[in-house]
Amino acid sequence: MQVSDFHFDLPDELIARYPQEERTASRLLKLDGNNGNLADGSFKDVLDLVEPGDLVVFNNTRVIPARVFGRKASGGKLEVLVERMLDEKSILAHVRCSKSPKPGTKLFLGENDEYEAEMVARHDALFEIHFTSDQSVLEILNSVGHMPLPPYIDRPDEDADKERYQTVYNEKPGAVAAPTAGLHFDDKLMADMKEKGVEFAYVTLHVGAGTFQPVKVDNINDHHMHAEYVEVPQEVVDAVAAAKARGGRIIAVGTTSVRSLESAAQDAVKNGTELVPFFGDTEIFIFPGYEYQLVDCLITNFHLPESTLIMLVSAFAGYDNVMGAYDHAVKSEYRFFSYGDAMFINKKTS
């Protein structure tokens, strides 16, 4: 398939620049992957769509304030966007400035040059930066960093984004983009789901800035995914086995939860084992033709045209069904992307 097969026209006014006042106030488009049937609703309908015995899998990554402004020792301004933390003192990052810094270049970060760092090495498009200040990377980012809103939101971050560009169940710092399907859940909805007899499990995938990078090839088979760190612990393995045994569905909240679960499943297939814990980088690329191993239902936002994420969803529910759903969503003026509306999708099984 060609990347252009996943194109759709999206009016600029349908890109959500701010979240709804309440997390659960978003709209929800329901898609049956077996027949393409659509139903419009509200995100609160999720409570009616889940059943006792289902297992809902969330990504508990926490978004770090990964965008930092500063200058080079020569005085030139720069912007650093963390891709991932390497250790307590070092990061891999995208750097925007008039002239790329060379190894050994001193950097001063923060509005008042609060922190000093050094550019150590370049790895393709990414720069390895080591902080020479006493504080850890996380302490520095929490002090002078900004929330890394996606480029299509096209506004400076605000104080409210520190809460709203973060799930209510976030736990492990490391993401530089939110697992956006999870932004719709609030404490009440999750408590109501628990009361109904729904089980929860938590994977971790630290979303990288690469999630916003355009696919630069024509044929999707030629695309190579960026690496992201994943944790699928023993508790998740046990919860999946228990849900399958009782006939419950595995419902993934977001494409990051899907990629975490399916990475563990692919690893098990490769090693000829049952599902086991998975800790490490994944470069899994899911597109039409992929056979899902674990996930039965998917809750996800509306994704960018020609992105790897709309390809993943198309593999889950069928290409024609998904493109038809997106056409309906545009005509029905759903809100798109990170702060936008969501879908609840049953997997195509036939």
Swiss-Prot record:
The keyword DNA damage does not apply. Signal peptide: none annotated. Its main location: cytoplasm. GO terms for cellular component: cytoplasm. Transfers and isomerizes the ribose moiety from AdoMet to the 7-aminomethyl group of 7-deazaguanine (preQ1-tRNA) to give epoxyqueuosine (oQ-tRNA). Monomer. This is S-adenosylmethionine:tRNA ribosyltransferase-isomerase. It comes from Vibrio atlanticus (strain LGP32) (Vibrio splendidus (strain Mel32)).
